[in-house]
Amino acid sequence: MRKYEIMYIIAPNLEESANKEIIERYNKVLTDNGAEILKVDEIGKKRLAYEINDFKDGFYVLLSVQANTEAINEFNRLIKINDNVIRVLVTKDEQ
């Protein structure tokens, strides 16, 4: 298993409870597929560098996980379907 860093941005027009639900849902997708979540950092609402889908702000979430490729692929597949997640980036952590 490799270490990955995942950052995704949730649309700012959602309630805090909806944000928590999205975070828990995608953490569960990872753990159900054999990943180990090392760290969850809810950075919070920040200004975007440029507008994405007419949003100027977004709720940032940063994950550090140890996972296999299948777990990451399933996470990517499911998170890209969700319209409330406006951007996602998965990178390998080489450390």
Swiss-Prot record:
GO cellular component terms, semicolon-separated: cytoplasm; ribonucleoprotein complex; ribosome
Pfam family, one: Ribosomal_S6
Keyword Ribosomal protein part of the UniProt annotation: yes
Presence of the UniProt keyword Signal in the record: no
Gene Ontology MF terms: small ribosomal subunit rRNA binding; structural constituent of ribosome
GO terms under biological process: translation
Organism domain of life: Bacteria
Keywords: Ribonucleoprotein, Ribosomal protein, RNA-binding, rRNA-binding
InterPro entries, sorted: Ribosomal_bS6, Ribosomal_bS6_CS, Ribosomal_bS6_sf, Ribosomal_S6_plastid/chlpt, Transl_elong_EF1B/ribsomal_bS6
UniProt xrefs under HAMAP family: Ribosomal_bS6 (MF_00360)
Family according to the record: Belongs to the bacterial ribosomal protein bS6 family.
Function: Binds together with bS18 to 16S ribosomal RNA.
Name this polypeptide is given: Small ribosomal subunit protein bS6
Organism, as annotated: Shouchella clausii (strain KSM-K16)
